[in-house]
Swiss-Prot record, chains A, B:
This is Nuclear transport factor 2B. GO terms for biological process: protein import into nucleus. SUPFAM superfamilies: NTF2-like (SSF54427). It comes from Arabidopsis thaliana (Mouse-ear cress). The modification N-acetylserine is found at S2. It holds the Pfam family NTF2. GO terms for cellular component: cytoplasm; nuclear envelope; nucleus.
Amino acid sequence: MSQMDPDAVSKAFVEHYYSTFDTNRVGLAGLYQEASMLTFEGQKIQGVQSIVAKLTSLPFQQCKHHISTVDCQPSGPASGMLVFVSGNLQLAGEEHALKFSQMFHLMPTPQGSFYVFNDIFRLNYA
Amino acid sequence: MSQMDPDAVSKAFVEHYYSTFDTNRVGLAGLYQEASMLTFEGQKIQGVQSIVAKLTSLPFQQCKHHISTVDCQPSGPASGMLVFVSGNLQLAGEEHALKFSQMFHLMPTPQGSFYVFNDIFRLNYA
């Protein structure tokens, strides 16, 4: 990860994350680890199993994320990366899309990839 | 910081940050350091002097932030803290408030306080 352009890495991550979310939500398990944290609309969840259980139990089946902005910054000397996303979430059968903001803290793995250490999601109500 | 409740610390930080922004913007200098990064509506800025120059040159004088949500998570073993904020920004003379999302990565100082290492700000356009 450290050898790649951070903006390119974060954009690739964001595309991978939301396309997995929209097509095969259980596949998100590969992006979290036991120490991973998710705060979803204020609810705190920890660990890959609990996080995937939460994401797969959300009260909608079909959805489509549309990304508006992606910002990234290195998070410090441990070579993590912060990714900040804004966009819209379209649920099947709903007329209006929901606006959301989400941040990820990506940490490198020994294999040269990365995983989601921190994840905070909020809907932006009008 | 490590001895305090993270939710209490993040809430206190958020109140301090936005009240300083709304009443004495140049006073935000005390919260950043040379390594600090700000991404403001996609524009990347580094260092306390450049960050404060940006914040004090925004094209409005009077403003008032209203906070809707504050979420926080520890960012890793270095005992930093991620703070994720959503809210509204009311500018003087404008009828409608602007929705925004912002994230801060707070890092501890040797004096037991903390400073803003990462700061990403986005308006959430309707």
